[in-house]
Amino acid sequence: MEVRKVNGFFIIFVIGYIGLSVVCASIMAYAQNSGIAVPDWIQYVMSEGIILLIAIIYMIVQKIDPIREIPYKRIGIVDVILSLVAGYCLIPAVLLISNLSMLFSTNYLEEGTTTLLTYPFAMQVILLAVIPPLVEELIFRGIFFGSYRKAGMTGAALMSGLLFGCFHLNINQALYAFVIGIVFAYMVEATGSLWSSVI
């Protein structure tokens, strides 16, 4: 996976994601206007589905073997615990960055997840803590970080974090996603597995 190719892929990825999201939103709006009840959770699944679809197409076109090039190796209990501790320690920093950024931007994530909180707990976990990490870590720490890593660890962590932040398309989420992306990159590097950032 060459750096220049993955740079170009990010542009295609964002354009494709926005374009397909608009198409899906239009279809959902048409269905609702036609009297068809469309659950709100559908849009969350569609959003992650679009990301996964683009990632799969890219891997097929570039002939990327996910088993060989995406580090999904098993991690030990110590790495699991350390990953959970690292994630927990990130919470204060994320909250601080989010609150500071809200002085000049809007927290769209908080507004968008309000409806999800009305769903059963199991569904909340699946929609917020299972599907997004699995899909987004594949593309950002798997494809992007994996590509940039060949040019050096520091640059790879910064670039994967930057792209992770930019992908969220709003200042509030972009700022703390940038920090999260960098930390997750180092976690993957330390454990040699994408599972450390997923959990």
What are these regions (language model features)?
Residues 1-68:
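N-terminal, membrane-interfacial amphipathic/helix-forming hydrophobic leader that caps
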Residues 22-26, 173-199:
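Functionally important transmembrane alpha-helices
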Residues 26, 56, 161-166, 182-186:
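Alpha-helical transmembrane segments of multipass membrane proteins
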Residues 32, 38-39, 67-138, 146:
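Juxtamembrane helix-loop-helix connectors linking adjacent transmembrane helices
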Residues 34-50, 123-124, 152-156, 160, ...:
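Membrane-interface starts of transmembrane alpha-helices
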Residues 45, 49, 80, 84, ...:
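Residue-level signature of the transmembrane alpha-helical core
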Residues 135-159, 186-193:
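Membrane-interface helix/loop boundary segments of multi-pass membrane proteins
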Residues 166-172:
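Membrane-interface helix caps and helix-loop-helix hairpins in membrane proteins
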